[in-house]
Amino acid sequence: MTVTPINPTNQPYKYVFVVIGPAGSGKTTMAKAVSEKLGFEYIEGDDLHPKANIEKMSQGHPLNDNDRWGWLHNCGGACAMELDKESIKGVVLTCSALKRSYRDILRSSLEHRPAILRFIYLAASRETLIKRTTSRKNHYMKADMVESQLAILEAPTADEKDVITISVENGKEQSEEECLDIVHKMVNENKQP
């Protein structure tokens, strides 16, 4: 489902880039780089989890769909609130959005906004994800949670036309450069849906 936004004012569209992928794929690092490059508002999706979700994950228990629904609506709502601000050109959100149905919730939460929504899927191998989560400090998502995320992961398919896939296997610098080049061109051309 690709949503065509409503734009009654014919003003330039704003952008929402949602950086998605399992724990350890580099969502926060990539989102901050995109936000900084474009001058967009940055929203850390992890900060929008209800306290119960954070406690559950901290104890090593994976979230289920019911745990995620409210969080996904919080993520979509936070983006919508930022888009309503006149001074905001765009938003960059981190959100795992592991399943297509999760991405569909984000799509539907923004469908009546004059904004172009694009997902940036950070593709990484199991080994890379475990290595990265093992080396993180002070984060509630531990390496053992990677398996539960990979078990439910529905990688974006070709019919999800609003998804940009970036491999992170060649290192941070190369993946950031590739991603920044794509989003910078897209925004500068103000591509309409």
Swiss-Prot record:
It holds the Pfam family AAA_33. It catalyses: D-gluconate + ATP = 6-phospho-D-gluconate + ADP + H(+). Pathway: Carbohydrate acid metabolism; D-gluconate degradation. One of its GO terms (molecular function) is gluconokinase activity. Its EC number is 2.7.1.12. Coiled coil: none annotated. PANTHER family: GLUCONOKINASE-RELATED. Belongs to the gluconokinase GntK/GntV family. This is Probable gluconokinase. The lineage of its organism: Eukaryota, Fungi, Dikarya, Ascomycota, Taphrinomycotina.
